Structure formats: structure tokens, C-alpha cells
């Protein structure tokens, strides 16, 4: 007859001992909830297109391209011409360029993808063309809202060595922009070697 009260006292003692642990656990859980909510909110925001993507998207359309190898003599006289179509992709998150040129009498086609990474706060680009099986990856920044973007990346020479590449994308107006490619020579100085002018078709 005395066992039940003794068991009851043990259960009560165990419950009292667990109260502080339960309180701490509850406080910890409540402290984590706002952080989790904040993380979810931030994740949702970074997945949506913002002003940077919107500005890139304004370049969508069809263009004529004039490609000049500015490091060569008579660059204007030897300029190559072609076309480019730029399209917004994946709900405004990226812009995809498909271009076709005739360079020194040979057809050359390329694909370029541009975007802005909301997490790293950097512009990103991937370039591919029929003159290579390699993909060129570039990251860039802008100090004027995307009107001028400075890209940097690496290319490869025929021996497989890495060569730094600097590219700028400069908006002239709503209907024209220029992409300039630069590299560093053996003397350590950077110089432009190619300039492509895009003019929107009317």
C-alpha cells in the first residue's frame, strides 16, 4: 500500500528536475524561430529578379554587330559584321545572346549568358563560340547601376596555359552598347584587342 505514494513522489521529483531543461529548450526554440523566418525571407528575396536583372533585360532585342580587332593595323577597314539576338530567360533572371558573324571570311557563331547574382552581388557571364570547345566564365561589378560592367575571367591559350581576360560592357544609349576585350601583354601592360559595337535593329 505504500508503493504507490513512493512512485508518485519519484514521478513528481523527476518532473521538477526536468522543468528547467524544458524551459531552456523552449527558449532556444523561440529564439531560433525569428532567425529561421529571416533566412526564409532572405532566400525568397534573392531568388527574384531585381533592378540589376531588369536593366540587363532592357538589352533584349535584335542587333547588328560590328567587330573590330583594334590592335591590328587598319582595324576599321578590316571590321567584321554580324547579327545578335538577345532574349530574356527564366522569368527575367538571365539574358541569353545568340550571335552570328563573318570574321575574316569565315562564319563564327556564339552564345553568351549574362546575369546578376543576388547573393554575391556580382554580375556573371558565360561565353561560348564555335572557335573553341571551352567555356569562358566571367564575374563583374558595376558602379553605375549596370551601365558599365567590368568583367574579369580566364581564357586558355593553345598550349593550355591560363590567360587573364578583362572585358567591359558599356551602355551608350537605349539602342547601342559596346563590349571591349582586353588582355595583359608580356610587358605587363593591359591593352584592348577587340571591340564589338551592338546597334539595335529598327
Predicted regions and their residues:
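Helix-centric, low-specificity signal for extended rod-like, repetitive segments
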Residues: 2-3, 20, 173
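N-terminal acidic, proline/glycine-rich, low-complexity intrinsically disordered segments
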Residues: 2-4, 25-30
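Bacterial N-terminal signal peptides
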Residues: 13-22
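Hydrophobic small-molecule pocket/channel-lining residues, especially in calycin-type beta-barrels
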Residues: 27-202
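Bacterial N-terminal signal peptides that target proteins for export
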Residues: 2-13
